[in-house]
Curated annotation (Swiss-Prot):
Chief localization: cytoplasm
Function (record text): Catalyzes the stereoinversion of LL-2,6-diaminopimelate (L,L-DAP) to meso-diaminopimelate (meso-DAP), a precursor of L-lysine and an essential component of the bacterial peptidoglycan.
Protein's UniProt name: Diaminopimelate epimerase
Keyword Cytoplasm: yes
Lineage: Bacteria, Bacillati, Cyanobacteriota, Cyanophyceae, Synechococcales
Subunit structure: Homodimer.
Site residues by UniProt (Could be important to modulate the pK values of the two catalytic cysteine residues): 171, 220
Assigned EC number: 5.1.1.7
Location in the cell: Cytoplasm
Length: 303
């Protein structure tokens, strides 16, 4: 008999995720520590369900209400994802209904993250303090006069002025004059794997419209082009703030919509506010279930 896995699909500004609830410790190790090939299969938009990543809601290991484990579409483990944690928050609120607590302490590989469901349905997330130390990001770029890692990345004959910020995961910010007329995919995939980032990096091409309005195009580590990146929007504001190019709060325009990002006083936590919405619920067919997730009791079991 095969284990039938229930899942839900959610999106935040078009950044979409498959969510599986394992808070009762009911998931097998083949789901909790999955084969990357299985994650790639279910995230495939032609042969699977299709998503930018997989999120597992798991029992806490420390003082959190639960633990989030997130995998990129290529099967690699991610430290944190801003749009993903908003989707998880909306998922939890939908499950709990009228008993919804409105606030959760969620354990991630980037530390405890605290999202709050607001009355208007938007989700405000305390994303924690940005990492500006090169070793913590990690990057080999060195600290510049603005107090964050800066430098040049060379792509053949092209030299790009860049900055780096960590939000529990690495981000490379590349200011450009025109977002539409850059070799986006070529630069994105090359910068993701640039030698200045030993753990690879998320890449954000940034245009500054005003001190209170930024626009970015996103190339996510392990996923490629996506419609939005919450941690990337936070990192972009931190970088422009320190470089004197923006205020400590701004709306960030992404292909999938708008996030409100603030870094009060340019110290402490960065806050991200934005939406997340359900798309559908489903059950994985046997062909999409983990290869070892076979057999439990006498009947097919939905968990």
């Amino acid at each position: 008999m095969l284990v039938m896995l229930q899942f839900s699909k959610y999106q935040g500004l078009g950044n979409d995720f498959l969510l599986i609830d394992g808070r009762e410790d009911q998931l097998t190790q083949q789901v909790i520590n999955p084969d990357p090939a299985w994650v790639r299969k279910i995230c495939d938009r032609h042969f699977g369900i299709g998503a930018d990543g997989l999120i597992l809601a798991l029992p806490p290991r420390a003082d959190g209400d639960l633990r989030m484990q997130i995998f990129n579409a290529d099967g690699s483990l991610a430290e944190m994802c801003g749009n993903g944690i908003r989707c998880l928050t909306r998922f939890l609120a939908d499950i709990e209904g009228d008993l919804c607590v409105q606030r959760w302490n969620i354990e991630t590989l980037a530390g405890i993250i605290c999202p709050v469901l607001q009355e208007d349905g938007q989700i405000c997330v305390d994303m924690g303090t940005p990492f500006l130390d090169p070793e913590s990001i990690p990057t080999t770029l060195t600290i510049g006069s603005a107090g964050l890692p800066q430098g040049e990345c060379h792509l053949g004959s092209t030299s790009l002025h860049v900055a780096a910020v960590g939000m529990g995961n690495p981000h490379l910010i590349v200011p450009v004059e025109d977002l539409e007329n850059i070799p986006f995919e070529n630069w994105g995939q090359r910068l993701e794997k640039h030698h200045a980032f030993p753990a690879k990096t998320n890449v954000h091409f940034l245009k500054i419209h005003s001190p209170n309005q930024l626009e970015i195009r996103v190339w996510e580590r392990g996923s490629g082009p996506t419609l939005a990146c919450g941690t990337g929007a936070c990192a972009s504001l931190v970088a422009t703030c320190l470089l004197g190019l923006s205020d400590d709060h701004a709306e960030v325009l992404l292909p999938g919509g708008v996030l409100q990002i603030s870094w009060p006083g340019r110290r402490g936590s960065v806050f991200m506010t934005g939406p997340a919405e359900p798309i559908f619920d489903g059950v994985l067919t046997p062909l999409l279930s983990p290869s070892h997730a076979e057999v439990l009791p006498q009947d097919d079991q939905i968990i």
